């Protein structure tokens, strides 16, 4: 899929857990996509090399079935090798312009902007397709992440890009984030720890409808 044929980044933006069992990772990711996730980001800090490539490849096949973009976290080389739909970059993960050169004009590039509107403006000027702010709330995934004031979302509207909120987002606080201007909510913990992952994904999805 090309960027132009993909839906915009919006709704539930699911980020994979650190799961080493590829079969289980695919199974739970399928549940999330069936529940209405608008995008899936492959992020696994417990695997690398061939295993990471195999996992991402399996998820890409899955996302193709659901016509949902697969975004690779932090790894432009892996995204290019798999022809994934895009990459998400943090401040230390490489240059947006270099990623665009490596991936081509049709891939999605997202940028972590933490609590910094100036960083978001810079990302937009370099060609990012969406910007992410967070942590919006205390996060078990990144407990030391800087906190982002949700007032940033309204200010970031000037960029004309989809805005993703991340960090400690649950069903209890997501509606306020959306009302503040987030186009998508990136969720890890509140999603994968659910007894019924598909139902939990659907609950998040319904907040946007």
Swiss-Prot record:
Its cofactor is Mg(2+). 4-amino-2-methyl-5-(diphosphooxymethyl)pyrimidine binds at residues 41-45, 73, 112, 142. InterPro entries: Aldolase_TIM, ThiamineP_synth_sf, ThiamineP_synth_TenI, TMP_synthase. CDD domains: TMP_TenI. GO terms for biological process: thiamine biosynthetic process; thiamine diphosphate biosynthetic process. Mg(2+) binds at residues 74, 93. Its EC number is 2.5.1.3. It catalyses: 2-[(2R,5Z)-2-carboxy-4-methylthiazol-5(2H)-ylidene]ethyl phosphate + 4-amino-2-methyl-5-(diphosphooxymethyl)pyrimidine + 2 H(+) = thiamine phosphate + CO2 + diphosphate; 2-(2-carboxy-4-methylthiazol-5-yl)ethyl phosphate + 4-amino-2-methyl-5-(diphosphooxymethyl)pyrimidine + 2 H(+) = thiamine phosphate + CO2 + diphosphate; 4-methyl-5-(2-phosphooxyethyl)-thiazole + 4-amino-2-methyl-5-(diphosphooxymethyl)pyrimidine + H(+) = thiamine phosphate + diphosphate. Pathway: Cofactor biosynthesis; thiamine diphosphate biosynthesis; thiamine phosphate from 4-amino-2-methyl-5-diphosphomethylpyrimidine and 4-methyl-5-(2-phosphoethyl)-thiazole: step 1/1. Keywords: Magnesium, Metal-binding, Thiamine biosynthesis, Transferase. One of its GO terms (molecular function) is thiamine-phosphate diphosphorylase activity. 2-[(2R,5Z)-2-carboxy-4-methylthiazol-5(2H)-ylidene]ethyl phosphate binds at residues 139-141, 168. Transmembrane segments: none annotated. GO terms for cellular component: cytoplasm. It is an enzyme of class 2 (transferase). Binds 1 Mg(2+) ion per subunit. It comes from the Bacteria. Condenses 4-methyl-5-(beta-hydroxyethyl)thiazole monophosphate (THZ-P) and 2-methyl-4-amino-5-hydroxymethyl pyrimidine pyrophosphate (HMP-PP) to form thiamine monophosphate (TMP). Belongs to the thiamine-phosphate synthase family. This is Thiamine-phosphate synthase. It comes from Methylobacillus flagellatus (strain ATCC 51484 / DSM 6875 / VKM B-1610 / KT).
